[in-house]
Every structure is written in C-alpha cells, then in structure tokens.
Amino acid sequence: QARTTIHEIEKLWPEVDLLHSNHGSLAYRRAFKAGLPRAYMRGYNEVLEVGPGWKWHNELTIRLPDGNDVHFHHGKSANIMTVGQKQGTCYVQGHYHTKYGISYWGNPSSLLWAMQVGCLIDKDSLAFAYDKVFKDRPIIGCGIIINSQPKLLPMVLNKGGRWNKLCP
C-alpha cells in the first residue's frame, strides 16, 4: 500500500530532494552493525520503486528568493532557534514528534527563522509503538515556505485522532 501511495506522490513530484532520517536508515544501520557489505543493500529509490529524480541528502541548504539560505536536516537539536543561529541560516527540521513551531531572531542584516515541522506518522502503527510510553503525543502536521516565509499546516484531527479532512 505504501508503494502505491508513493507512486501517486511521484507522479505529482517527479523531482524531489529528501532527507535521510533515523527511521528510514534503521535497516541500513542494523545491516552495517551485523557486518553486511553495503553492496548487498538496496538504495531507497530501489526499495520505494521511484525514479532517479528523488535525491536523498543527509542535509541540504538552498537559497530562498529573499536571499537568505535555509538549511534542512532531519533533526539536530530540540532547540531549533539555537541550531539556526549556529548555522547562521534559516533552519527546518523534523524528528521531534512532539515539537511544532516557528522561532524568529534578528541580526543586523536580516530577520531569520527556524521551523520545527512535527511529523506525519500514523500514531497507531507498529513503527511508532515505542511512543506509547511517553506522556506527550505526536503533533501531526507539516510546514511549507512561501515567499521565503515559513508556514505551519497542522493536520486537524477529530476526537478519535483521525484526520477530519479539513485543511487549515
């Protein structure tokens, strides 16, 4: 089922820059620890059955229309503003499932920001079962950048924790 959905997404966006994550790389880390040579491992695109237009990065920096750079990483620290300030760029990350927000700071030449985008995980999936022991629940949502400015798009959930089909 996941591949069917991914194929639909690939039709919409045949060229995508994606970030490696601790979830996606788990199989690779376990194989490496067990001593399997890298040559025996299939790449993400082969596993997902997507074309070469999907490119994977550990981290990525792009120039925004306003001239500022924005740095993307799966997750370096729960304090996004500190990471952005140390990078000297705007900054976007995921990883911290219970964090969701935008922080701003200024310097003599510009207004910069950092955005924590939450996650899009199915809280009931086996892959996320480890989270049941934590008191904080995941925040389901994503972020976008329009005209060099960050915007958060939370997934509006009903009382049962399912998407109510509304977009903010």
Which residues does each predicted region cover?
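Generic beta-strand structural signal
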Residues: 14-16, 58-60, 68, 141
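Acidic carboxylate-rich catalytic motifs and surrounding loops in phosphoryl-/glycosyl-chemistry enzymes
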Residues: 17-23, 57-58, 153-157
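Conserved beta-strand segments of alpha/beta enzyme cores
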Residues: 15-17, 53-55, 71, 113
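C-terminal/domain-terminus segments
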Residues: 156-168
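Conserved beta-sheet core of the metallophosphoesterase superfamily
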Residues: 67-157
